[in-house]
């Protein structure tokens, strides 16, 4: 399965609670942290929800 690298670049303060919960569900603990996740429909849906807070890169 393909992998994607997600970097959290903007704070979730001031946004709805469910967006902060999505950031935590993606595995982030600190701002500017990067995580590598499987490229699945569930992960893509979470990224879509917080696309204004994260940067996405494909890992080859």
Curated annotation (Swiss-Prot):
This is Large ribosomal subunit protein uL30. GO terms for cellular component: large ribosomal subunit. It comes from the Bacteria. Keywords: Ribonucleoprotein, Ribosomal protein. Pfam families: Ribosomal_L30. The keyword Transferase does not apply. CDD domains: Ribosomal_L30 (cd01658). The gene is rpmD. GO terms for biological process: translation. It comes from Dehalococcoides mccartyi (strain ATCC BAA-2266 / KCTC 15142 / 195). Belongs to the universal ribosomal protein uL30 family. Coiled coil: none annotated. GO terms for molecular function: structural constituent of ribosome. Part of the 50S ribosomal subunit.
């Amino acid at each position: 399965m393909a992998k994607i690298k997600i970097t959290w670049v903007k704070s979730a303060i001031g946004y709805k609670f469910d967006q902060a919960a999505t950031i935590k569900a993606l595995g982030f603990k600190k701002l500017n942290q990067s995580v590598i996740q499987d490229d699945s429909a569930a992960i893509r849906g979470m990224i879509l929800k917080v696309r204004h807070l994260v940067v996405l890169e494909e890992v080859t």
